[in-house]
From Swiss-Prot:
Protein's UniProt name: Nicotinamide-nucleotide adenylyltransferase 1
Cell location: Cytoplasm
Keyword Nucleotide-binding: yes
GO molecular function, one term: nicotinamide-nucleotide adenylyltransferase activity
Amino acid sequence: MRALFPGRFQPFHLGHLQVVKWLLDRYEELIIMIGSGQESHSPYNPFTAGERLVMVKESLAETGIDLRKVVIFPVMESFTSKNWIRIVEMYSPHFDVIISGNPLVYTVAKEAGYMVERVPMFNRDIYNATRIRKLIMENDLKWMECVPKSVSQFIRDIKGDERIRDVTKNDYTED
């Protein structure tokens, strides 16, 4: 069976990596769909789809995951219930089940007739992209403990940490 694991991965962190390992223990193949591909350079979505694709691929390679069992692709989407699932169907290879921790994705997929499974949360209080972006914004280096080494290095190489601090400044923040 082939599972679809959609997410924004802003950034891809160790919790996501644990989910990928968990899924590959249960399914023959895994499709990782990088959602909101049209979004970047904002506090909620600081990284481009291409940057996130690199983060995911390098994390899996770093961990020794057989990339022949994984398809990774970004998708631009309109998140209305009916449109989202149709867009996924247009861009994704065939899948048998959708795996998500997002209640809206779970509900939309189920209502569209797909087999769905809730993804387990691995240390969500620590491995949480919102928390990681906040740590980066606050220049707290603990964020690097929450992501694979390749992601930490990639974010620093592209100055993604600086980008997050820049895009979260408001009009009242001093330079």
